[in-house]
């Protein structure tokens, strides 16, 4: 799978789907929701989660998931009201 969407930038609409040659993903996963070095960023994890929910609404993703971060799970529990998700750590 091509490395697209990693970091704090966004891929243009359609770029990922074209690169992986699929119409949708079964699972969109945030494995480790932070960088390995400190980079100033105003990106809020809630914005990231809402973007993932938008992908579910658009039919591009069936499920979302978080792994290895109990703090992110707390945020997802608070803000995720409509979509099932899985957290494993």
UniProtKB/Swiss-Prot annotation:
InterPro entries: AKR, NADP_OxRdtase_dom, NADP_OxRdtase_dom_sf. Substrate binds at residue 31. Transmembrane segments: none annotated. Pfam families: Aldo_ket_red. Gene3D superfamilies: NADP-dependent oxidoreductase domain. GO terms for molecular function: oxidoreductase activity; structural constituent of eye lens. It comes from the Eukaryota. The keyword Cell membrane does not apply. Keywords: Eye lens protein. Monomer. Belongs to the aldo/keto reductase family. This is Rho beta-crystallin. It comes from Lepidodactylus lugubris.
């Amino acid at each position: 799978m091509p490395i697209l969407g990693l970091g704090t930038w966004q891929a243009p609409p359609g770029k990922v789907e074209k690169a992986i040659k699929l119409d949708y993903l079964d699972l969109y996963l945030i494995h480790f929701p932070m960088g390995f070095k400190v980079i100033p960023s105003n990106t809020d994890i809630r914005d990231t989660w809402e973007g993932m929910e938008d992908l579910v609404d658009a039919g591009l993703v069936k499920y979302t998931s978080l792994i290895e971060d109990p703090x992110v799970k707390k945020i997802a529990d608070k803000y995720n009201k409509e979509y099932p998700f899985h957290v494993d750590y």
